[in-house]
Design a protein with these regions (language model features):
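Conserved signature/switch motifs of ABC ATPase nucleotide-binding domains
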Residues: 119-122, 139-140
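Conserved ABC ATPase "signature" region
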Residues: 50-51, 87, 91, 98-115
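ABC ATPase "signature
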Residues: 205-206, 214
Length: 324
């Protein structure tokens, strides 16, 4: 069985990159290939220009120290305190006691657990346990943090706080974060770039704002789920995605005035994602798609992504296809 097949992934330094997919898509295997917990059959794993597949022994161990990892299941040692769990990797690395104590105190302050340093895992909440896991993963001052479904076992409020912490660490430390998730909301909240994975392959990838503006994007439909609307006889249903400055333009009223048509708004949403204002609208225009070619071209020329809904919602037509 091939778990990951022909995947090319580039994560820019200092960004948060999310890999989104259902269970069994190959996400966890991909993540384990990054730090060579799974060794790929072919290809390269480059971090800071070094190919991990070419390293052995001490060289590989040093490279792995630059990669932290957190998991869905926290993996804390029940016999150790919070501080003791964070100190454990430092002990393994042979860090002197005084330096170790200072680093543990720094990390606990970073994740907001200073007051719980002497508590045991059984005495703290799930969200606090994940904070311990994050502090432990950062003990060796890694440049890269891998997150394997780190929030999937948490309630929504705690999930939001952990995602906020990860974004804060990304910005304060210049940390590069590669996370996998099956939750669209995780991508919406903190990811700069993302990829959608099915059956071991990427079906789309790139900066989130670019994916949202791409006609037919699965990610755009997932982040902004609009109610299903099949075209009525003699009408055209259009899904319009707009990013950045386009969110401030009155394109609906401009369309109605220019072509003297009644435009019906069936649904919509506007949010801030990856620092950009992004929105989607579902519009209904009178007439079949062939009649609305000029109107669709008008929307596209305004810098909008346009999907024309067919009777099969899984097979939208783009504005370009409709114009042909």
């Amino acid at each position: 069985v091939t778990a990951v097949d022909g995947v090319d992934l580039t994560v820019r330094e200092g960004e948060v990159f999310g890999v989104l997919g259902r269970s069994g898509a190959g996400k966890s295997t991909l993540l384990r290939c990054v730090n060579l917990l799974e060794r790929p059959d072919s290809g390269r794993v480059l971090i800071d220009g070094s190919d991990l597949l070419a390293l052995r022994g001490a060289g590989l161990r040093r490279a792995r120290q630059g990669i932290g990892m957190i998991h869905q299941h926290f993996g804390l040692l029940g016999s150790r305190t919070v501080a003791g769990n964070v100190a454990f990797p430092l002990e393994v690395m042979g860090v002197p006691r005084a330096e170790r104590a200072a680093r543990v105190a720094e990390l606990l302050d970073l994740v907001g657990l200073t007051e719980h340093a002497r508590a045991y895992p059984a005495q703290i909440s799930g969200g606090q346990k994940q904070r311990v896991g994050i502090a432990r993963a950062l003990a060796g001052r890694p440049k890269v943090l891998l997150s394997d479904e780190a929030t999937s076992a948490l309630d929504p409020e705690t999930t939001a706080s952990i995602l906020e912490l990860l974004r804060d660490l990304n910005r304060r430390l210049g940390l590069t974060v590669l996370l996998i998730t099956h939750e669209m909301d995780v991508v919406k909240r903190i990811c700069d770039s993302a990829a959608v994975m099915h059956a071991g392959r990427f079906t789309e990838s790139g900066p989130v704002t670019e994916l949202l503006a791409r006609p037919g994007s699965e990610l755009a439909r997932g982040l902004f789920p609009l109610p299903p609307a099949e075209p009525r006889a003699g009408s055209t249903v259009v899904e319009v995605t707009f990013v950045g400055g386009a969110t401030e333009e009155p394109f609906v009223s401009a369309l109605a005035r220019k072509y003297s048509v009644d435009v019906n708004i069936l649904g919509g949403a506007v949010e801030t994602i990856a620092g950009e204002r992004v929105g989607r609208l579902q519009l209904e225009l009178p007439g079949e798609p062939s009649v609305n070619a000029a109107q669709l071209a008008f929307l596209r020329e305004a810098g909008l992504s346009v999907d024309v809904r067919t009777s099969d919602p899984a097979e939208p037509l783009t504005a370009e296809e409709d114009a042909r």
